[in-house]
Curated annotation (Swiss-Prot):
Disulfide bonds join C32-C61, C39-C54, C44-C62. Residues 1-19 form the signal peptide. This is Sperm-associated antigen 11A. GO terms for cellular component: acrosomal vesicle; cell surface; extracellular space. The lineage of its organism: Eukaryota, Metazoa, Chordata, Craniata, Vertebrata. GO terms for biological process: antibacterial humoral response; antifungal humoral response; defense response to bacterium; negative regulation of interleukin-1 alpha production; negative regulation of interleukin-1 beta production. Pfam families: Defensin_beta. The gene is Spag11a. It is found in: Secreted. It comes from Mus musculus (Mouse). Has antimicrobial activity against E.coli. Plays a role in the defense response in the male reproductive tract, contributing to sperm maturation, storage and protection. Its main location: secreted.
Length: 71
């Protein structure tokens, strides 16, 4: 029974290492600042679009419309 479970647990470990999960705290704020944005509570100001979430709960990254997407 153990030899049959070994490949299963090995594949779970591989998946956990391949997809590490969420970004560590504080990094999201830095990413927002690198996009020339500001972390704001709930809503963005006029002339800003809503981006990704920031490290603090409920905060969103607000990026000005003048900054073009680099994708």
């Amino acid at each position: 029974m153990i030899p049959r479970l070994l490949p299963f647990f090995a594949s779970l470990l591989f998946a956990a290492l391949l997809f590490p999960g969420d970004i560590p705290p504080g990094i999201r704020n830095t990413v927002c600042l690198m996009q020339q944005g500001h972390c704001r509570l709930f809503m963005c100001r006029s002339g800003e679009r809503k981006g990704d979430i920031c490290s603090d709960p409920w905060n969103r990254c607000c990026v000005p419309y003048s900054v073009k997407d680099r994708r």
